[in-house]
């Protein structure tokens, strides 16, 4: 499903988070429970599990994938590359969700085809705000040609 159809989604928005930090995964899940949007959230622990999950027959393809950069076994950059090269996955909206504020990471993920980059917030309320902002983005604008001006989102 194309990312720009998220805004017109009739059922729940399918969200997938790939993050090796258990505390971050739990906070992420709790934040979505408190946001007043219909979402279904799936969690995976690292890049290998992410790609295995996405390649399963009949697996839920997320509308939005939140992807941590620094994960064991397969990092977020490698996952992003594989997703963008796979015909069945390339249209998934990919949001880099990382503690890194490095200009190099931001530039590299932009060039490799991520749609949005957000830094992990420091508190729960900021997390809820940024997640709601990401889910309610006008994805047509964010996917119709990469624009660095709107790539880095802040809360």
Predicted regions and their residues:
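Short, glycine/charged-rich "phosphate-handling" switch motifs in NTP-dependent
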Residues: 115
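CheY-like receiver
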Residues: 126, 131-132, 136-155
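Conserved acidic segment of CheY-like receiver
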Residues: 12-33, 65
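Active-site residues of response regulator receiver
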Residues: 67-68, 98
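Receiver (REC) domain active-site loop signature in two-component systems and cognate sites
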Residues: 71
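Acidic, metal-coordinating helix/loop segments flanking the phosphotransfer/catalytic sites
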Residues: 43-64, 128
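A Lys-centered signature of the CheY-like receiver
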Residues: 120
